[in-house]
């Protein structure tokens, strides 16, 4: 007999049957339970892998959409800049046209005013000449005491007008 009691026959048979029972239990578990657990684990692993693949696919699609939206936003900004530039250019052209039209209208008004002034001046000069001629004729008739012929009359009128024009021209330059 073994003093430790490990190799005693009654203990050895108990250990033997415990090992046999354990092996039978393992065989039964391996045969009936393990395949079910393994299948469930594989199914779960496949579901997780599929979920990861779908998440990555969704993430990739989201990135593509984000890039597409960014491109669209940038294109819209570029288009908006073009529209603003075109509007500014058109506004500037419109202002230039309005300035040019105003300048032309001002020039026309000034030209009409100058023409009107010239007509009025010419009319005033004709009136003054006529009145001066009448006064010269009356004055010369009184001084001379007789009627003048047409040539003498014309000469006196021209002298008076030249004298008057010289005075007017002298007054303008002063």
From Swiss-Prot:
Q: Note whether Transmembrane occurs among the keywords.
A: yes
Transmembrane portions of the chain? 9-29
Q: A Pfam family for this UniProt protein? A: ATP-synt_B
Q: Name one GO cellular component term.
A: proton-transporting ATP synthase complex
Topology in the lipid bilayer: Single-pass membrane protein
Keywords assigned by UniProt, alphabetized? ATP synthesis, Cell membrane, CF(0), Hydrogen ion transport, Ion transport, Membrane, Transmembrane, Transmembrane helix, Transport
Q: Does the keyword Cell membrane apply?
A: yes
Free-text function comment from the UniProt entry: F(1)F(0) ATP synthase produces ATP from ADP in the presence of a proton or sodium gradient. F-type ATPases consist of two structural domains, F(1) containing the extramembraneous catalytic core and F(0) containing the membrane proton channel, linked together by a central stalk and a peripheral stalk. During catalysis, ATP synthesis in the catalytic domain of F(1) is coupled via a rotary mechanism of the central stalk subunits to proton translocation.
What is the name of this protein? ATP synthase subunit b
Organism, by scientific name, is Rubrobacter xylanophilus (strain DSM 9941 / JCM 11954 / NBRC 16129 / PRD-1)
